[in-house]
């Protein structure tokens, strides 16, 4: 009865299956946690979604910015970019079923027994856990409703970048989406910076990685996240687990077995290219 946490798959189906075989994942008894960005860049987004959906209650996942971008393409809001390699998925006979399932997935996972929280980009230090839960539910409710295309059309943008309980409407939903799926750096007060993508040692002052700023959630829970492949899984404080190691760029797909904190990796089938093409502003 093991819990396996795996970083951003990005359509790397063959590597995902090989990694699960390596750890002897058994859906009947084990649980798989996925940090989001299941799709795009790799060649197997369709197979990834079909497989993950088939796992039912054996999987716990969160949505990432590329997953949201896929939903926006599906809704006719965003352009299908060839480099994302999404056409086989969008043209599949079960595309409607898969994508309507995908849009009903959460932005946040919490296991109180394990004191473990997972979100694609992390947890902004401006939130306590109750606020994070409420904010996740706000976006999840819209995504699972019939009005989800209206939200997807309005989610693109970098502002507002400072949390306030007084935020409302689309501005509130956009901040929540950015915090859960796009965040990397913050100002010392926790305000989001949506522009810098430099490695932490090269980040302009006064910016800090979100996980370097103490917050209520990181002080009480472990946090697993993906999104930031250029970290290569390194440089985070104790209890903060960066799991995106750039499989779709030629790096590795990384798995953390929670019970003993042992790592497993599956090398990418692609050539190394760690230039993160994060043009998706979802």
Curated annotation (Swiss-Prot):
Function (record text): Hydrolyzes diadenosine 5',5'''-P1,P4-tetraphosphate to yield ADP.
Specify the protein name: Bis(5'-nucleosyl)-tetraphosphatase, symmetrical
- Family indicated by similarity: Belongs to the Ap4A hydrolase family.
Q: What is its EC number?
A: 3.6.1.41
Q: Does the keyword Hydrolase apply?
A: yes
- Could you tell me what reaction this enzyme catalyses? P(1),P(4)-bis(5'-adenosyl) tetraphosphate + H2O = 2 ADP + 2 H(+)
Q: What PANTHER family does the record point to?
A: CYTOCHROME C5, PTHR40942
Tell me a Gene Ontology molecular-function term this record carries.
bis(5'-nucleosyl)-tetraphosphatase (symmetrical) activity
Question: Keywords for this entry?
Answer: Hydrolase
């Amino acid at each position: 009865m093991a819990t396996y946490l795996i970083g951003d798959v990005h359509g790397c189906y063959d590597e995902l299956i090989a990694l699960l075989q390596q750890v002897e994942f058994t859906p009947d008894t084990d649980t798989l946690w996925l940090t989001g960005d299941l799709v795009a860049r790799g060649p197997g987004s369709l197979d990834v979604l079909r497989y993950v959906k088939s796992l039912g209650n054996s999987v716990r996942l969160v949505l990432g910015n590329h997953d949201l971008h896929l939903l926006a393409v599906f809704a006719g809001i965003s352009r299908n970019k060839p480099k994302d390699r999404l056409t086989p998925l969008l043209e599949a006979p079960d595309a409607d079923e898969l994508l309507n399932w995908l849009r009903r997935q959460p932005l946040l996972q919490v296991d109180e027994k394990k004191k473990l929280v997972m979100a694609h980009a992390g947890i902004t230090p401006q939130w306590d856990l109750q606020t994070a839960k409420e904010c996740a539910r706000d976006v999840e409710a819209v995504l699972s409703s019939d009005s989800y295309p209206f939200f997807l059309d309005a989610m693109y943008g970098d502002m507002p970048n400072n949390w306030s309980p007084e935020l409302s409407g689309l501005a509130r939903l956009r901040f929540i989406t950015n915090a859960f799926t796009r965040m990397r750096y913050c100002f010392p007060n926790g305000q989001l910076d949506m522009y810098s993508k430099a490695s932490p040692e090269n980040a302009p002052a006064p910016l800090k990685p979100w996980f370097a700023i103490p917050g209520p959630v990181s002080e009480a829970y472990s946090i697993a996240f993906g999104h930031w492949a250029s970290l290569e899984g390194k440089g985070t404080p104790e209890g903060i687990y960066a799991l995106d190691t750039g499989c779709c760029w030629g790096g590795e797909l990384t798995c953390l077995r929670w019970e003993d904190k042992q790592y497993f990796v599956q090398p990418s089938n692609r050539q190394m290219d760690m230039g993160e093409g994060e043009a998706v502003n979802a």
